[in-house]
């Protein structure tokens, strides 16, 4: 029976992704997985994968791990995001000092967020999608950067690019091309459309 809402397993501990799903009226069960993302990234690079293909592979691997021992009709969603600066991938910063270095490299330039989402039903993948929002950072001053890092602190270490667009990080930018949910790590509208196609949400 179709309804306005449905229940999803989210293969992530991301509070931003969970918030997006819950705000859309979906019931979410977070199920973070233990995935060696760096090893998978290296494997993808060795195989000559693009950053878009790597983002999809990472999301797929997370969903695959989270779907072990799930019911036949259970739905699992997983996502991944890679910051692409002229073909160079950025990982999440490991320290505030590394976050500062990332932001200096991104300052005054345009980067792309390769944002992948996959959907599993039972143990089988039924759908995947990739969004690629483009973001341009303004040429902010060193004083602004220092104040920004003091304001945000370790909170930005969980964010690729060292910014939260839904917070003070918006002040880093002069232009954003793409929907905010994709920037936040989950292309929500395409996912909702697929859930309607699967007849688990009312059309």
Curated annotation (Swiss-Prot):
- UniProt cross-references to InterPro entries, sorted A to Z: ITPase-like_fam, Maf-like
GO biological process per UniProt = nucleotide metabolic process
Spell out the reaction equation it catalyses.
a ribonucleoside 5'-triphosphate + H2O = a ribonucleoside 5'-phosphate + diphosphate + H(+); a 2'-deoxyribonucleoside 5'-triphosphate + H2O = a 2'-deoxyribonucleoside 5'-phosphate + diphosphate + H(+)
Which positions are catalytic residues?
80
Places the protein is found: Cytoplasm
- Protein name listed in UniProt: Nucleoside triphosphate pyrophosphatase
Q: What is its EC number?
A: 3.6.1.9
GO MF annotation list: nucleoside triphosphate diphosphatase activity
**Class of the enzyme per the UniProt entry, highest EC level:** hydrolase
Q: Which Pfam families match?
A: Maf (PF02545)
- Function in brief: Nucleoside triphosphate pyrophosphatase. May have a dual role in cell division arrest and in preventing the incorporation of modified nucleotides into cellular nucleic acids.
Source taxon at top rank: Bacteria
Which family is it part of? Belongs to the Maf family.
**Cofactor(s) in the UniProt record:** a divalent metal cation
UniProtKB keywords: Cytoplasm, Hydrolase, Nucleotide metabolism
Q: Name one GO cellular component term.
A: cytoplasm
